[in-house]
Design a protein with these regions (language model features):
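Conserved beta-strand/loop positions that form the S-adenosyl-L-methionine
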Residues: 57-59
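Short SAM/SAH-binding signature in class I
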Residues: 134-136, 150-158
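Conserved beta-strand signature within the Rossmann-like core of class I S-adenosyl-L-methionine
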Residues: 153-155, 182-190
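Rossmann-like AdoMet
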Residues: 1-54, 72-105
Length: 226
């Protein structure tokens, strides 16, 4: 599937990709960087830093922003993170250059790691740093069947249910629930009522928390021991 994509600037100065056909962005127009940090680091990774070794699945690698921010945190907090990222329609080198996320990264190591994440081979785990490895999975979520009890955290960063409703189905959430370890967490920017109801039906304990700039709420869904 060929999707038209264009680069736009968000409110915090960082850029994102806009899909005119769907009127959908890869990140919030209120701030790509702010959204990624708030949703996936503050309300996702931070819940697990006590573990020191963490397994993460990202649904929607996209620009790689969540991956590189997580890689940076792994170094800062001396964590070992095994990261898996699913992507069906990879971003091109030209688009990555136009996004210029390297300008927001803190040091040369982070900029180098960001380039390594995008140059890594698909469908095989590669070490990016002593603290971070990644397996980029080139496939559609509907085709996946992950092992049970595999992940501590799922970054659910797919396009919204308005444009990709098939990715937000009860069947998908049931499959992801099984893939999480006990007390694992699925975190997403989306707070729509139907999504939360389906997450609960799939077995999750759902919690609404304040969202990033421009969003009142976001969702955390836990796999709790009964």
């Amino acid at each position: 599937m060929k999707i038209q994509r264009e680069i736009i600037e968000t409110s915090d100065g960082s850029k994102t990709i806009h899909l005119p056909e769907w009127n959908e962005n890869y990140h919030s127009h209120h701030g790509a960087l702010q959204e990624a940090k708030h949703v996936f680091l503050k309300n996702g990774l931070d819940d697990f830093v006590h573990q020191k070794e963490i397994s993460i699945l990202e649904i929607g690698l996209g620009t790689g922003l969540n991956a590189i921010l997580t890689c940076q945190e792994a170094t800062k907090q001396d964590l070992k993170i095994n990261y898996s990222a699913l992507e069906a329609y990879p971003v091109s080198e030209e688009e990555l250059e136009a996004l210029n996320y390297q300008s927001f990264l803190e040091d040369e190591f982070a900029r180098s790691h960001y380039a390594q994440i995008h140059s890594a081979e698909w469908n095989q785990r590669q070490t990016i740093s002593p603290n971070f490895s990644i397996n980029k999975i080139l496939d559609q979520l509907e085709n996946c069947n992950f092992e049970k009890n595999q992940f501590d955290i799922i970054y659910f960063d797919a396009f919204g249910p308005r444009v990709q409703g098939e990715l937000w189905s009860l069947e998908i959430f049931q499959m992801l629930f099984k893939s999480l370890k006990s007390n694992g967490l699925l975190v997403t920017y989306c707070a729509k009522g139907q999504v939360k109801r389906d997450l609960k039906t799939a077995g999750f304990v759902v919690e609404c928390v304040p969202g990033p700039p421009g969003k009142r709420e976001m969702t955390k869904a836990f796999k709790r021991d009964l």
